[in-house]
């Protein structure tokens, strides 16, 4: 009688072929955007939009006279969050 572990190992062997399929599924198209004849990666536009939005957020925080601790970490995290949101929303 097979044990639970051996049954799990058998199921894993049956479905292990699908892992490489998911790993190469992102290789279908290059996420590049043509601008004036040159192709720029889409993450570049997400970074630019994120930088602009982070600077706007910084200006709002400064005008509200809010003092933040760990400013570098906070703005870096905001930049990353905004970039990922732009990527999720537009690409």
From Swiss-Prot:
InterPro entries: YtcA
Residues with lipid group (N-palmitoyl cysteine): 27
Top-rank lineage group of the source organism: Bacteria
Membrane topology: Lipid-anchor; Multi-pass membrane protein
Keyword Cell membrane recorded: yes
Membrane spanning stretches: 33-53, 70-90
Localization per Swiss-Prot or TrEMBL: Cell membrane; Membrane
Listed GO CC annotations: plasma membrane
Keyword Endoplasmic reticulum: no
Entry-linked Pfam families: Ytca
Protein name: Uncharacterized protein YtcA
